[in-house]
């Protein structure tokens, strides 16, 4: 129902408009208070890059974060990542991830980023505290924040917004009548707009998610997606239909598709009930970080990577590299650039 309301297919959004106006007023006042200096903005002696959304729901933000971290690491820069840690509940914050950290503590996305990149990752409700914790523990050149576009207490140097190219902004209204955290005009103030799927408009950077071979949760074996049939597909992400569409685009039609809520907490018995003996369970990589501890031999996940046009790489990275150079000794910065 909420998807129909947000897409504009249902007129029921009218009933929620009073709450949306209130949401919009509050968020505008919060941003205004930071811009006027009435609230403290925490700044740090290195570049902060925010990769965020204007809308609620999955837009492909985390693959962009993974791409950015990898690009900076390949150039020799020391990258840290901070996150709110949605879906996690740690005993204390800020929490620095290590080999003993679970998704129950830090959330699924931070754990996925840590496992994929090896970059130091910290989570905290106040992202500035997460940045401070990273800097106490590591020598870093740049920090990337996974989400947090609307977390104005954290000063930032670069802002990227990721948009779902098919859904874009839905009916255009603020939460809860629509999907918007901020209005579309906010795009005029960011350094890059990256569009996941669909058609990018002038000035936007097109991106697509490319699936790799499926990976077994227990053994790490990699196999071609088509060789896994029959498949039961599950997705506990912001927009499950995108995952199922990726499977069909890869030539696989699952015998069943089961959509869960974002940051779903799984149990072995729950997933066992979905799969017959001859079937294989296929999930997103984000789901896999929560299921690996109790996985079965027939459970697989599908990693995806952000693919951007070759010409966009330089345009996206140059402002970040310049910001790093400004914050580092000239010789050190030029050596890495």
Curated annotation (Swiss-Prot):
One of its GO terms (cellular component) is plasma membrane. ATP binds at residues 55-62. InterPro entries: LpxK, P-loop_NTPase. Pathway: Glycolipid biosynthesis; lipid IV(A) biosynthesis; lipid IV(A) from (3R)-3-hydroxytetradecanoyl-[acyl-carrier-protein] and UDP-N-acetyl-alpha-D-glucosamine: step 6/6. It holds the Pfam family LpxK. HAMAP family: LpxK (MF_00409). This is Tetraacyldisaccharide 4'-kinase. The lineage of its organism: Bacteria, Pseudomonadati, Pseudomonadota, Gammaproteobacteria, Enterobacterales. The gene is lpxK.
